[in-house]
Amino acid sequence: DLLDLINLFKSYPSRIPVDVIELTKQTIVKMFGWLHIMSHGDDKVSFFNDSAFGIAPEHAILREYATKLGFAINELVTPTDALIVHNMQNTGYVSVKTAEMNLIADLAPVGPSYIPGHAHADSLSFELSLGKSRVFVNSGTSLYGISIERLRQRGTSAHNTVEINNKNSSQVWSGFRVAKRADIGNRLVGKVTSS
């Protein structure tokens, strides 16, 4: 949507304030960075909450569109000898990347808090890919509406996390409802060094 706005701004350059254009451009660059961090080695989205393939354009198509609009958006590559920890406190997610591995973890509160209809009981879940192969993934979602399968996909057992006493970490019910929500306290993210 923001790329489309930039396209429109180019069509009406004298009508859009320069600061609005610049802010939109800066936001697009940040969004591509976030997309890279939250994606696996296969260049596709991770399956947290109601994520699924085939809903949004493929990453390569978005990069191509951005390039046509004048952005220098390339596939980001993690250096071969690096271990990079991305602690995205605003969203609650954490990504740990090397050149061949990507671990993405959900340390986020259930949200958005005002309307969490697309949330799953996936607190503390993670996904892991090695190269372009996904090793551990959450279920994501394959359908909407009210059904047993929808509830199963939103439940804790459909995610790579701990389920205690067959209970969901958050109370998900109906197709898009959440009652009591998991709360992650004392969130601490960092590298551990060996002695």
Residue ranges and their predicted role:
Residues D50-A52, S142-S195:
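CBM-like, beta-strand-rich accessory domains located in the C-terminal region of large
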Residues L3-V137, A182, K191-T193:
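Carbohydrate-active enzyme catalytic cores, enriched for enzymes
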